[in-house]
Amino acid sequence: MHTPVLLKEMLEILDPQDGKIYVDATFGAGGYTKAILNAANCKVCAIDQDKHTSIFYEELANNFPNRIHFFINKFSQIKQVLLGAQLERVDGVVFDIGVSSMQLDDANRGFSFSKNGPLDMRMSTSNSIDASVFVNTVSEEEIANIIYQYGGEKYSRKIAKAIINFRKKKVIETTGELASIVRSVVSRSKNHDINPATRTFQAIRIWVNKELQELEQGIMCAADLLNPGGKIIVVSFHSLEDRIVKMIFKSLCSDEISLKLNTGFQLINKKIVRPSFEEILNNPRSRSAKLRAILKI
């Protein structure tokens, strides 16, 4: 079961109001959407590129008739999606970035190093390139660079060399094979909290799904869609994502961007909002979550 992270904090900042329209740009299992719909007599446009999430939409649509619209698409396409639904402005957009618990827990999706399955990692099956294409065709130098840049893995060159050596013998087809390759050259950390394959899997997933480009484009499009008083809330899970969110928010708050967009933005929370100790105890996957928010003025 997917447990929404920083749900209470997100709701307090968004402060849903009757008659307003909000966007859940990363619908998933619908946790944020359900909470927003329960908080006020408002409407939610829910977006997710993963077609497997439609089952959760159907359940919410029955419970909240005529108050939720669902679109299978990437959130970088948020502007086109809303214009297609004849919506030009909204009052808030929430992003919960990264892979969901549902995707991690399904071995067939190929996201998890702890469950053996096909090496896929695509959030949308419409993408033609999956993780197996990456590890079996990309050069050693590029593999090393991606794992270092997107995963912060200091052993990226050793891992890349091990991948190349393995694929000379056979095609790398499963998550189990890739995890084993990484473990062959990287030992478990002293605190035992981080699996040796964590950073490599993260980096490849980000590359496959173009997650950082999607994030930047999605936030900028969302900023252009907000009514005055509208908010953008982003929950991210690793430092690379958070740096991008921080950079974009800082840019949106600058005078130069305000003049270009003919509007202004201000930070809602100058300090990062993090999960409480209690939330981390109840949901260990929340431990690295960071929330940032911005207001259109």
From Swiss-Prot:
Its main location: cytoplasm. Its EC number is 2.1.1.199. InterPro entries: RsmH, SAM-dep_MeTrfase_MraW_recog, SAM-dependent_MTases_sf. One of its GO terms (biological process) is rRNA base methylation. It holds the Pfam family Methyltransf_5. It catalyses: cytidine(1402) in 16S rRNA + S-adenosyl-L-methionine = N(4)-methylcytidine(1402) in 16S rRNA + S-adenosyl-L-homocysteine + H(+). The keyword Transferase applies. One of its GO terms (cellular component) is cytoplasm. It is found in: Cytoplasm. Keywords: Cytoplasm, Methyltransferase, rRNA processing, S-adenosyl-L-methionine, Transferase. S-adenosyl-L-methionine binds at residues 30-32, 48, 75, 96, 103. The keyword Acyltransferase does not apply. It comes from the Bacteria. Coiled coil: none annotated. PANTHER family: 12S RRNA N4-METHYLCYTIDINE METHYLTRANSFERASE (PTHR11265:SF0), S-ADENOSYL-METHYLTRANSFERASE MRAW (PTHR11265). Belongs to the methyltransferase superfamily. RsmH family. This is Ribosomal RNA small subunit methyltransferase H. It comes from Ehrlichia canis (strain Jake). The lineage of its organism: Bacteria, Pseudomonadati, Pseudomonadota, Alphaproteobacteria, Rickettsiales.
